[in-house]
Amino acid sequence: MRPLTPRQAEILELIKRNIAETGMPPTRAEIATRLGFKSANAAEEHLKALAKKGCIEIMPGTSRGIRLPVEEEDNSETGLPLIGQVAAGEPILAQEHVEQYYQVDPSMFHPSADFLLRVKGDSMKNIGILEGDLLAVHKVQQARNGQVVVARVDDDVTVKRFEKKGNLVYLHAENEDYSPIKVDLSFQSLTIEGLAVGVIRNGDWL
Protein backbone atom coordinates (compact mmCIF):
# COMPACT_ATOMS: atom_id res chain seq x y z
CA MET A 1 0.00 0.00 0.00
CA ARG A 2 1.25 3.50 -0.82
CA PRO A 3 1.96 5.65 2.27
CA LEU A 4 -0.84 7.86 3.56
CA THR A 5 -0.72 11.53 4.39
CA PRO A 6 -1.56 12.37 8.03
CA ARG A 7 -5.01 13.60 6.97
CA GLN A 8 -5.71 10.44 4.97
CA ALA A 9 -4.65 8.29 7.92
CA GLU A 10 -6.98 10.30 10.16
CA ILE A 11 -9.92 9.74 7.81
CA LEU A 12 -9.20 6.02 7.48
CA GLU A 13 -9.11 5.66 11.27
CA LEU A 14 -12.41 7.57 11.52
CA ILE A 15 -14.01 5.17 9.02
CA LYS A 16 -12.78 2.11 10.92
CA ARG A 17 -13.94 3.46 14.28
CA ASN A 18 -17.36 4.42 12.92
CA ILE A 19 -17.85 0.91 11.51
CA ALA A 20 -16.78 -0.63 14.83
CA GLU A 21 -19.09 1.65 16.81
CA THR A 22 -22.22 1.73 14.64
CA GLY A 23 -21.82 -1.09 12.14
CA MET A 24 -21.77 1.32 9.21
CA PRO A 25 -19.34 3.80 7.63
CA PRO A 26 -19.78 7.56 8.07
CA THR A 27 -21.33 9.76 5.40
CA ARG A 28 -19.26 12.39 3.59
CA ALA A 29 -21.06 15.08 5.59
CA GLU A 30 -20.26 13.34 8.87
CA ILE A 31 -16.58 13.10 7.94
CA ALA A 32 -16.55 16.79 7.02
CA THR A 33 -18.20 17.77 10.30
CA ARG A 34 -15.96 15.66 12.53
CA LEU A 35 -12.72 16.70 10.86
CA GLY A 36 -13.58 20.35 10.27
CA PHE A 37 -13.84 20.40 6.47
CA LYS A 38 -15.81 23.23 4.90
CA SER A 39 -17.90 20.86 2.78
CA ALA A 40 -18.63 17.23 2.05
CA ASN A 41 -16.84 17.69 -1.29
CA ALA A 42 -13.54 18.10 0.55
CA ALA A 43 -14.14 14.79 2.31
CA GLU A 44 -14.98 13.20 -1.04
CA GLU A 45 -11.59 14.18 -2.48
CA HIS A 46 -9.78 12.52 0.42
CA LEU A 47 -11.93 9.40 0.03
CA LYS A 48 -11.03 9.18 -3.66
CA ALA A 49 -7.34 9.40 -2.73
CA LEU A 50 -7.78 6.61 -0.17
CA ALA A 51 -9.54 4.49 -2.79
CA LYS A 52 -6.68 5.02 -5.28
CA LYS A 53 -4.25 3.80 -2.63
CA GLY A 54 -6.33 0.67 -2.05
CA CYS A 55 -7.35 1.53 1.52
CA ILE A 56 -11.10 1.66 0.87
CA GLU A 57 -13.64 0.84 -1.82
CA ILE A 58 -16.21 3.44 -2.87
CA MET A 59 -19.66 2.27 -3.94
CA PRO A 60 -21.40 5.01 -5.97
CA GLY A 61 -24.99 6.02 -5.44
CA THR A 62 -25.18 5.78 -1.65
CA SER A 63 -24.20 8.23 1.09
CA ARG A 64 -22.53 5.49 3.13
CA GLY A 65 -20.94 3.75 0.16
CA ILE A 66 -17.56 3.17 1.78
CA ARG A 67 -16.20 -0.32 2.35
CA LEU A 68 -12.95 -1.66 3.74
CA PRO A 69 -11.45 -4.19 1.31
CA VAL A 70 -11.18 -7.75 2.56
CA GLU A 71 -7.39 -7.68 2.52
CA GLU A 72 -7.43 -4.76 4.95
CA GLU A 73 -9.44 -6.60 7.58
CA ASP A 74 -7.48 -7.55 10.68
CA ASN A 75 -7.57 -11.32 11.03
CA SER A 76 -4.98 -11.50 13.82
CA GLU A 77 -7.81 -11.95 16.34
CA THR A 78 -10.84 -14.11 15.77
CA GLY A 79 -13.94 -14.86 17.78
CA LEU A 80 -15.94 -12.52 19.99
CA PRO A 81 -14.12 -9.71 21.79
CA LEU A 82 -14.49 -9.52 25.58
CA ILE A 83 -14.90 -5.87 26.51
CA GLY A 84 -13.22 -4.70 29.70
CA GLN A 85 -13.13 -1.26 31.26
CA VAL A 86 -14.74 1.30 28.94
CA ALA A 87 -13.11 4.72 28.81
CA ALA A 88 -15.32 7.80 29.02
CA GLY A 89 -16.40 9.06 25.61
CA GLU A 90 -14.88 6.15 23.69
CA PRO A 91 -16.76 3.62 21.51
CA ILE A 92 -17.40 0.41 23.44
CA LEU A 93 -15.77 -1.66 20.67
CA ALA A 94 -12.61 0.44 20.52
CA GLN A 95 -9.58 -1.86 20.34
CA GLU A 96 -8.17 -0.57 23.62
CA HIS A 97 -11.24 -1.93 25.46
CA VAL A 98 -10.77 -5.52 24.26
CA GLU A 99 -9.33 -7.78 26.98
CA GLN A 100 -9.20 -10.94 24.89
CA TYR A 101 -11.07 -12.93 22.23
CA TYR A 102 -13.24 -16.00 22.87
CA GLN A 103 -13.60 -18.67 20.21
CA VAL A 104 -17.38 -18.44 20.14
CA ASP A 105 -19.56 -18.66 17.03
CA PRO A 106 -21.63 -15.42 17.01
CA SER A 107 -24.44 -17.15 15.09
CA MET A 108 -25.17 -19.40 18.08
CA PHE A 109 -27.09 -16.45 19.47
CA HIS A 110 -30.15 -14.82 17.93
CA PRO A 111 -29.65 -12.18 16.82
CA SER A 112 -25.95 -12.90 16.44
CA ALA A 113 -23.58 -11.57 19.09
CA ASP A 114 -21.05 -8.82 18.36
CA PHE A 115 -19.16 -8.80 21.66
CA LEU A 116 -19.04 -10.15 25.20
CA LEU A 117 -19.29 -8.16 28.42
CA ARG A 118 -18.33 -9.46 31.87
CA VAL A 119 -21.21 -9.05 34.33
CA LYS A 120 -20.50 -7.14 37.53
CA GLY A 121 -22.89 -7.33 40.47
CA ASP A 122 -26.16 -9.20 41.02
CA SER A 123 -28.73 -6.65 39.84
CA MET A 124 -30.00 -9.02 37.10
CA LYS A 125 -29.84 -12.30 39.05
CA ASN A 126 -33.59 -13.00 38.83
CA ILE A 127 -33.29 -13.70 35.10
CA GLY A 128 -30.09 -15.72 35.45
CA ILE A 129 -27.50 -13.05 34.67
CA LEU A 130 -24.98 -13.47 37.49
CA GLU A 131 -21.75 -11.93 38.73
CA GLY A 132 -18.84 -13.06 36.55
CA ASP A 133 -20.98 -14.28 33.64
CA LEU A 134 -20.06 -13.33 30.10
CA LEU A 135 -23.03 -11.57 28.53
CA ALA A 136 -23.35 -11.95 24.75
CA VAL A 137 -24.42 -8.64 23.22
CA HIS A 138 -25.87 -7.76 19.81
CA LYS A 139 -24.84 -4.23 18.83
CA VAL A 140 -27.80 -1.88 18.30
CA GLN A 141 -28.47 1.79 18.92
CA GLN A 142 -32.18 1.60 19.78
CA ALA A 143 -34.25 -0.62 22.05
CA ARG A 144 -37.89 -1.49 22.67
CA ASN A 145 -39.57 -1.50 26.06
CA GLY A 146 -38.93 -4.74 27.93
CA GLN A 147 -35.64 -5.60 26.25
CA VAL A 148 -32.52 -6.23 28.33
CA VAL A 149 -29.91 -3.75 27.16
CA VAL A 150 -26.34 -2.70 27.70
CA ALA A 151 -26.70 1.04 28.25
CA ARG A 152 -24.25 3.84 28.87
CA VAL A 153 -25.61 6.49 31.22
CA ASP A 154 -23.30 9.47 31.07
CA ASP A 155 -20.06 7.43 31.29
CA ASP A 156 -21.27 4.40 33.28
CA VAL A 157 -22.07 1.12 31.47
CA THR A 158 -24.88 -0.99 32.94
CA VAL A 159 -27.06 -4.01 32.06
CA LYS A 160 -30.76 -3.43 32.75
CA ARG A 161 -34.29 -3.90 31.37
CA PHE A 162 -35.28 -0.93 29.20
CA GLU A 163 -38.45 1.14 29.56
CA LYS A 164 -39.11 4.51 27.94
CA LYS A 165 -41.96 6.88 28.83
CA GLY A 166 -41.83 10.09 26.86
CA ASN A 167 -38.57 11.85 27.66
CA LEU A 168 -37.84 9.56 30.60
CA VAL A 169 -36.04 6.23 30.46
CA TYR A 170 -36.15 3.71 33.31
CA LEU A 171 -33.49 1.04 33.53
CA HIS A 172 -34.92 -1.72 35.70
CA ALA A 173 -32.93 -4.26 37.67
CA GLU A 174 -34.10 -7.86 37.99
CA ASN A 175 -33.44 -7.88 41.72
CA GLU A 176 -35.77 -6.35 44.28
CA ASP A 177 -32.82 -4.88 46.19
CA TYR A 178 -32.16 -2.37 43.41
CA SER A 179 -34.23 0.67 42.44
CA PRO A 180 -34.69 1.62 38.77
CA ILE A 181 -32.20 4.02 37.24
CA LYS A 182 -34.14 7.05 36.01
CA VAL A 183 -32.70 8.97 33.06
CA ASP A 184 -34.16 12.31 31.95
CA LEU A 185 -33.15 12.65 28.30
CA SER A 186 -33.66 16.41 28.42
CA PHE A 187 -30.39 16.82 30.29
CA GLN A 188 -28.79 13.38 30.72
CA SER A 189 -26.89 11.31 28.18
CA LEU A 190 -28.04 7.75 27.40
CA THR A 191 -26.53 5.48 24.75
CA ILE A 192 -27.81 2.01 23.91
CA GLU A 193 -24.74 -0.14 23.26
CA GLY A 194 -26.56 -3.39 22.52
CA LEU A 195 -29.11 -6.06 23.42
CA ALA A 196 -28.40 -9.01 25.70
CA VAL A 197 -28.77 -12.17 23.58
CA GLY A 198 -27.23 -14.88 25.76
CA VAL A 199 -25.00 -15.81 28.68
CA ILE A 200 -21.84 -17.89 28.98
CA ARG A 201 -21.08 -19.23 32.46
CA ASN A 202 -17.96 -21.22 33.29
CA GLY A 203 -17.53 -22.10 29.62
CA ASP A 204 -21.09 -23.46 29.31
CA TRP A 205 -23.95 -22.20 27.13
CA LEU A 206 -27.01 -21.14 29.10
Curated annotation (Swiss-Prot):
Pfam families: LexA_DNA_bind (PF01726), Peptidase_S24 (PF00717). One of its GO terms (biological process) is DNA replication. It catalyses: Hydrolysis of Ala-|-Gly bond in repressor LexA. GO terms for molecular function: DNA binding; serine-type endopeptidase activity. Its EC number is 3.4.21.88. The active site is at 123 (for autocatalytic cleavage activity), 160 (for autocatalytic cleavage activity). Keywords: Autocatalytic cleavage, DNA damage, DNA repair, DNA replication, DNA-binding, Hydrolase, Repressor, SOS response, Transcription, Transcription regulation. The record marks 88-89 as: Cleavage. Residues 28-48 bind DNA. InterPro entries: LexA, LexA-like, LexA/Signal_pep-like_sf, LexA_DNA-bd_dom, LexA_repressor, Peptidase_S24_LexA, Peptidase_S24_S26A/B/C, WH-like_DNA-bd_sf. Disulfide bonds: none annotated. CDD domains: S24_LexA-like. It comes from the Bacteria. It is an enzyme of class 3 (hydrolase). Represses a number of genes involved in the response to DNA damage (SOS response), including recA and lexA. In the presence of single-stranded DNA, RecA interacts with LexA causing an autocatalytic cleavage which disrupts the DNA-binding part of LexA, leading to derepression of the SOS regulon and eventually DNA repair. Homodimer. HAMAP family: LexA. Belongs to the peptidase S24 family. This is LexA repressor. It comes from Shewanella sp. (strain MR-7). The gene is lexA.
